[in-house]
Amino acid sequence: MTQDDLAFDRRHIWHPYTSMTSPLPVYPVQSAQGCELQLASGEQLVDGMSSWWAAIHGYNHPHLNAAMKTQIEAMSHVMFGGITHAPAVSLCRKLVAMTPEALECVFLADSGSVAVEVSMKMALQYWQAKGESRRRFLTFRRGYHGDTFGAMSACDPDNSMHSLWAGYLPDNLFAPAPESRFDGEWDERDIVGFARLMAAHRHEIAAVILEPIVQGAGGMRLYHPEVLKRIRRMCDREGILLIADEIATGFGRTGKLFACEHADITPDILCLGKALTGGTMTLSATLTTRAVAETIRNGEAGCFMHGPTFMGNPLACAVANASLELLARGEWQVQVAAIEAQLKRELAPARAAETVADVRVLGAIGVIETHQPVNMAALQRFFVEQGVWIRPFGKLIYLMPPYVISPEQLSKLTDAVLAAVAHPAHFAP
């Protein structure tokens, strides 16, 4: 890329969560291979983000590339209305087989946020078909479900960027975020606020929606599996649907194939995305039970009212099939367990740093929470100088590396994080 390209980028192109008039610096990437990004300037950066948690097999994986090359020779896209094709059928067959038994109906969409929108629309249409006006969703504070309007309405209304949209979004119900840590003691008080809200509004609630075990972009918080068990029982008792948003956690990130497995529960609706294609193309899936699908079918519309232009994109489905084939080999379990052990060992010294409030690890997720917000520009520059790509936010420096990362590459990431928290200049005063 030329300096003119970078100047055009700075003046004309919005990047995620970035000002157009005073944007943060961007780093031009020329190529990616395995677990490393090569900058246009020639530096190699070990990637600790998996491109926002999606590239679980690393970059330029030959099995994924081969699947896309083969598919693009046949067709890159065809509409899914009135048409079907082998890549979509094969993918949905795999998803039905690998998710909990009750989840047998699949809706393919284009992104994680859309998968959440689809799940919420399913819940609303379900109750419309049953003749009940249930239009609210119950969830936890500190949650994050995406940036589209329906998804935003289920995100924390106060402790997130979505407070900007107060007054425009549907009025949903928010219980206090769970405080019992994943690896700690269960505190019965953790579910009291949630239970009270459900009891008070049970005839208004279409569904509970939550991120199982890991509250991702809302704070990278890891909570106790008992929370899920209690909520599943409450939903069963009140006849309320349970939506599990596993966009970030699905496909092995927490050490289980799906985070719901930590509590041995099955949701009524399951949202998947990010790692579905191994980080190569945008694709998501929303799965539900036969009972939910048939109830929607019997409603006034006679069908589920949603249909994205790129629904079931053959190219994305083909590479998703290849990604799931890699997962089916089972190597991810050993890889994630090794990453977890190394993260626990190598991030532990950060607890002694004055800048650090907490350190937590689960599966291939390592989180350092700091007392003060990070100085994004300064810290990003520092990480690049250290030869790593880590994208902190708020008071969080976290790692979600590809599963195929080597111990040496992972140590380079953890060394950079330890060096970062040793310097107060990397944080807001």
UniProtKB/Swiss-Prot annotation:
Its EC number is 2.6.1.62. Coiled coil: none annotated. SUPFAM superfamilies: PLP-dependent transferases. One of its GO terms (biological process) is biotin biosynthetic process. PROSITE patterns: AA_TRANSFER_CLASS_3. It is an enzyme of class 2 (transferase). It catalyses: (8S)-8-amino-7-oxononanoate + S-adenosyl-L-methionine = S-adenosyl-4-methylsulfanyl-2-oxobutanoate + (7R,8S)-7,8-diammoniononanoate. InterPro entries: Aminotrans_3 (IPR005814), Aminotrans_3_PPA_site (IPR049704), BioA (IPR005815), PyrdxlP-dep_Trfase (IPR015424), PyrdxlP-dep_Trfase_major (IPR015421), PyrdxlP-dep_Trfase_small (IPR015422). It is found in: Cytoplasm. Pathway: Cofactor biosynthesis; biotin biosynthesis; 7,8-diaminononanoate from 8-amino-7-oxononanoate (SAM route): step 1/1. One of its GO terms (cellular component) is cytoplasm. This is Adenosylmethionine-8-amino-7-oxononanoate aminotransferase. It comes from Pseudescherichia vulneris (Escherichia vulneris).
